[in-house]
Structure formats: structure tokens, C-alpha cells
A protein has these predicted regions:
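Short glycine-/acidic-enriched loop or helix-start segments at secondary-structure transitions
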Residues: 17-18, 78-79, 106
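Conserved N-terminal substructure of TIR/SEFIR domains
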Residues: 1-62, 143, 147-163
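Low-complexity, flexible helical/coil segments
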Residues: 14, 40-47, 70-71, 101-107, ...
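Conserved beta-strand termini and adjacent loop/short-helix elements that scaffold enzyme active sites
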Residues: 36-38, 97, 122, 132
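Conserved beta-strand-loop-alpha-helix hinge of the TIR/SEFIR fold
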Residues: 59-85, 93-103
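Anion (oxyanion) recognition and catalysis
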Residues: 88
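Short, glycine/charged-enriched secondary-structure capping and boundary segments
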Residues: 20-23, 81-84, 109-111
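C-terminal interaction surface of TIR/SEFIR-family domains
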Residues: 4-6, 105-163
Length: 163
């Protein structure tokens, strides 16, 4: 059975780069969740943050690994931070994949790399929780050959969590 993986990304800025990663994943017979059509997302978003949170929670069901596709602003986005926190709560393995060097399909440009030492939340004692301290690995999709290695990274992280 294919591993069910949740992909988290900054929709507005990185949808095209994210689709490149997603398509490489599903063409290899894997199941990807966390992707939504823009019109559907806008409809959910109009219903408010709670509706978006419910959608995210539903998408996370049955997943064992969360892959955060890191663009320039990804880790600062509230919904991405929510996805990361909920993934950790459910015990998902967590990896980061930098996607800044993937050319955007529309503009054919690359973007800036996001800072992986970003605060994505706070512990109960108000100390900051940094993404790079919480994840099981950070990779670069282009420079680390993500097309061929994404599955290896995901399986390695899953095994660390006994999944």
C-alpha cells in the first residue's frame, strides 16, 4: 500500500513549484494529500479560519509523514504553521524540502530560499519552537535530486517514527 503523505506549502506563492514536486510523487505511484484546487480553496477560505483548519485536519487523517515544501515565505504562513503543529500532534514524521530552485511554470524564475530556522510556534513555557529543530531532515529538491530521492527521505523519516 502506498504511503499517504501530507504536503504543506504556501499556496499563493508556491503552488506551481509545489505541483512539480507533487506530480513527481504521484507519477511514481504514491498518494499525495494537501493539494486543493484554487477555486475550492477560496471557497473554504471565505468560510473562515475554522473551516480551513477543519479541512486541514481532515486531510491529515491517515497520513504518517508531512512534507513541508519550503519557499521564501512558507514557514511564516499561519496555515502552514497550523499544519506543522497538527502534524506533530498526531505523531507524523516531518521533513522540509526547499523548492526555491524549481523554476516557476509561469515566470520560469526561481525564488529566494526560505529560512528553515523560523519560529513556527511556541512551547507551553513560551520558548520558541524552530522548524529546523523539529523536523527529521531538510533537503533541497533540485540540488539533492528530489525527483529520485523524495521517497527515500520520506521513508527514512517514517522509520524514525516507527511508521
Amino acid at each position: 500500500m502506498a504511503r499517504r503523505v501530507f504536503f504543506s506549502f504556501h499556496y499563493q506563492n508556491d503552488i506551481n513549484r509545489s505541483m512539480t514536486v507533487r506530480n513527481s510523487w504521484v507519477t511514481q505511484g504514491k498518494e499525495a494529500v494537501g493539494f486543493i484546487d484554487k477555486a475550492d480553496f477560496e471557497q473554504i477560505k471565505r468560510q473562515g479560519d475554522n473551516a480551513v483548519h477543519r479541512w486541514i485536519d481532515k486531510q491529515l487523517e491517515g497520513t504518517s509523514v508531512t512534507v513541508v515544501l519550503i519557499g521564501a515565505e512558507t514557514l511564516n504562513r499561519p496555515f502552514v504553521q497550523y499544519e506543522i503543529c497538527k502534524s506533530l500532534e498526531r505523531g507524523n514524521a516531518l521533513i522540509g524540502v526547499k523548492i526555491h530552485a524549481i523554476k516557476d511554470m509561469r515566470t520560469l524564475r526561481v525564488s529566494c530560499s526560505g529560512n528553515t530556522h523560523s519560529i513556527i510556534g511556541y512551547y507551553n513555557n513560551k520558548l520558541p519552537a524552530y522548524f529546523d529543530n523539529l523536523c527529521d531532515g531538510i533537503y533541497d529538491y533540485v540540488f539533492d535530486d528530489g525527483y529520485n530521492n523524495l521517497g527515500v527521505w520520506i521513508e527514512s523519516a517514517a522509520k524514525k517514527h516507527g511508521k
